[in-house]
């Protein structure tokens, strides 16, 4: 029986609806951890003032590319910008690892008939987190490089690597073995993976647009809300990819 996108969408939404409470708690918890880590590792207010003091200069160079703007910064400004970027990247990576590990564990255990909370899902995924951390770091780095050089290679790599976390968590395969198998399966089943990935990307952009217009929220609260909603979208994609991989294995 051929695998159809409609069947996968229906199964994914049913699982998402039935486990909404646990998934929502997992999305909020990992969002809070991400924002907390970002706050902890970001430069302090005095250092950030170094960047804000030259805000007028940045506005005047709006027509320039990012590389030209960075080259015009002083060494102090470049160092502060590097710290801000590193804090944001590290916190997002840790949050994504916890979300992916916890979500895949939740899906697997619920599929086996067990009831599990968000905290227990993260705890049960602990043995897999180091491997997932390395996997997501490599995949994120390659995708970002592809997007920076030219958008299309980054999108293609995102699609190719989409099944790698599921393979790693489910079959306990190594990082590179998971990436290799993911590329093979993703391209062979592009007709059901590409639409889901495009919907995921569109939903993420929609969430970003919506939250950016909620001016009543403080920056920290807005960050938690944005990250939590983004995590919910990613959780739904993980359910879809997990279900797809289970069908491909059978």
Swiss-Prot record:
Entry's localization field: Cell inner membrane
Entry keywords, A to Z: Cell inner membrane, Cell membrane, Membrane, Transmembrane, Transmembrane helix
Principal cellular location given in the protein's record: membrane
Signal sequence range: none
Transmembrane feature ranges: 23-43, 87-107, 132-152, 156-176, 192-212, 222-242
Pfam families: UPF0259
Membrane topology of the entry: Multi-pass membrane protein
A GO term from the CC aspect: plasma membrane
Family: Belongs to the UPF0259 family.
Protein's name in the database: UPF0259 membrane protein Spro_2675
